[in-house]
């Protein structure tokens, strides 16, 4: 994956996730969508940077042929990625939403379950469809 494709991939991933998670979190927590959107955007920016670094090294260690990765490797990839997010997201969620650490942990657990399936499905579909290459061909 080129640097531009990595950025495209990360931004597309985050935008689609925010479109799903912000309304769902507003329903679950009773917090305003604007507060949740601010938290979501802040964590998404952090996530985009983490995504770029994590996937750059993951591809170096496990090969860059993403289309042939097994389900087990995809699940391992997702678990490792999400683990790196937990250490930042729980304190940020608790502080910004003014909730207890335990409630932030429970909310993060829900996000983790969502993203385990979302990331696995998104990355599988992205690798099969390869939208960046198709968009480049259309624009060139």
Curated annotation (Swiss-Prot):
Keyword terms, alphabetized: Antiport, Cell inner membrane, Cell membrane, Membrane, Transmembrane, Transmembrane helix, Transport
A Pfam family: BTP
UniProt protein name: Short-chain diamines transporter
Domain of life: Bacteria
Family: Belongs to the proteobacterial antimicrobial compound efflux (PACE) (TC 2.A.117) family.
Primary site of residence: membrane
Segments crossing the lipid bilayer: 7-27, 36-56, 79-99, 105-125
